[in-house]
Structure formats: C-alpha cells, structure tokens
From Swiss-Prot:
Pfam families attached to this UniProt entry: EFP, EFP_N, Elong-fact-P_C
GO cellular-component term (any): cytoplasm
Protein name: Elongation factor P
Reported function: Involved in peptide bond synthesis. Stimulates efficient translation and peptide-bond synthesis on native or reconstituted 70S ribosomes in vitro. Probably functions indirectly by altering the affinity of the ribosome for aminoacyl-tRNA, thus increasing their reactivity as acceptors for peptidyl transferase.
GO function terms (MF aspect): translation elongation factor activity
Record bears the keyword Protein biosynthesis: yes
Annotated source species: Roseobacter denitrificans (strain ATCC 33942 / OCh 114)
Amino acid sequence: MPKINGNEIRPGNVLEHNDGLWAAVKVDHVKPGKGGAFAQVEMRNLRNGSKLNERFRSADKVERVRLEQKDQQFLYEDAGMLVVMDTETYEQVQLPAELLGERRPFLQDGMTIVVEFYEEEALNATLPQKVVCKIVETEAVVKGQTAAKSFKPALLENGVKVMVPPFVGQDENIVVNTETMEYSERA
C-alpha cells in the first residue's frame, strides 16, 4: 500500500489509520501564519460508521488503501443477508443488508450493485443512481393548487414516502434518485 503525505489527502481517499479503515469525508488544508501547514480531515470508519476529526501535518505519512470494486447482481435476501453474484466469476457471496443503510428498500431483484472489497471483506455497497418505482398511494390533485410549484406525498411499492409533483398519479412509475431519495422524473 502506498504511503502519502498529509497534504496529499483528498475527499474519498481510504486511509489505514489507528488500526482501522477510514474514508476521508471532508478535507481542509490550513496554512497558519505561524507554524507548518496541515490538513484537517473528517473521516468515517468503514467498519462501524463512527466519525473522527484528525489533523495531519504535511510531513506526516499515512497509508492510502485501494478498495477493489466489483459489480454484483442481487439475487435474494436471506435472514438479513443479501445474496449476490459476481457478474464476472458467477461466484455467490452473502453480504450484510446494513451495507446499503437507508437505501435498502430500493434494492430490486436482479439489480446490479457495486460492492467495495478490502482483502475479501465487503465494506460498502452502492445502488444505481436512478431506480424505477411504482406509486401505490397518493393524494388527488386539488384544482387551483398548481399556481405555485408544489409537491404532494406519495407512497411507493417499497414502503418509502417521497414528494412528487401534482401531475403524478397513483399506479404510475417514477424514477427516484437513490442518493437523495427524491423524485427525479416520470418513468
């Protein structure tokens, strides 16, 4: 693993620090009038999700870790574990459902997700940015309500509530952004 200087840390870098794997979330490079320059780094632990603020001087060396990204096809869920298949080797692997966090309801059968591995350990999973969902319940449009830009709540088939424009009705398919968990467009 390559070592990098403290001033080379960028957001998104994965670092091995204090016997753990940390993702740099926010990096501020500071050059005070007195003393040496340093990087103030906000980090998130990839194994337990805890946060840490750390200061690295320019001369400090830190291990930068490269995660292996693999496309995996979701097959089914079994007792809180997601069973996925590697799209290249067709090998089946079980992953904890917690890897997806609050985006778990958007996972659909046959969907391809990107899983990040470090030494055969799955640390993170990412859904496609846009997913098609069906609206099962929403309010009817009230005449004259569309004078200003307005939204109404809608319940999706996966149990998630999103705000949609008034022209979208029940039993319609919409595209939802899985990163922001917001309505994107009609499908």
